[in-house]
Amino acid sequence: RDTDRSRGLGDVYKRQGHKTTHNILATKAFTVSMGTADTVAQCDYVGIVSGNKEPDKFAKAGFHAVKSEFVNAPLIAELPMTLECELLTYDKESCYMTGRIVNISADEAVIGDDGKIDVFKLRPITYDPIHHNYIALGEKAGNAFSDGKALK
């Protein structure tokens, strides 16, 4: 895996009582792995099944946890991109947490010719809360910090 050290921030919402929340609060670290179009069923499974009720949910999904070199939290070996974060804040009332991204790891298979993560190779998914679908991202819609100049 190629890695990129970063200083960004990540925000996450995790409900109390979840095994993940307990682990994050205990270790003061977490990872956010990017689901892909090829891993929709596995990612959905680990999202809907509680680790408190199914301790082997990673194995049932065909996932393997591996230790991060940068934070005290696991990476999912089968997912090609992961944000590795240190916990900065956790609000018990809202269950909202903020972390500092200390590293971004990516599988060589999703790295483009320019040495950066290629979204077209990654094929990340996002959740559509209106229709309850997963949407694969990857079509270029425009040029950032450029297309808007036409309106000046």
Which residues does each predicted region cover?
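Single conserved hydrophobic/aromatic residue that forms the stacking wall/gate
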Residues: 2-13
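Active-site-proximal mixed secondary-structure blocks
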Residues: 16-152
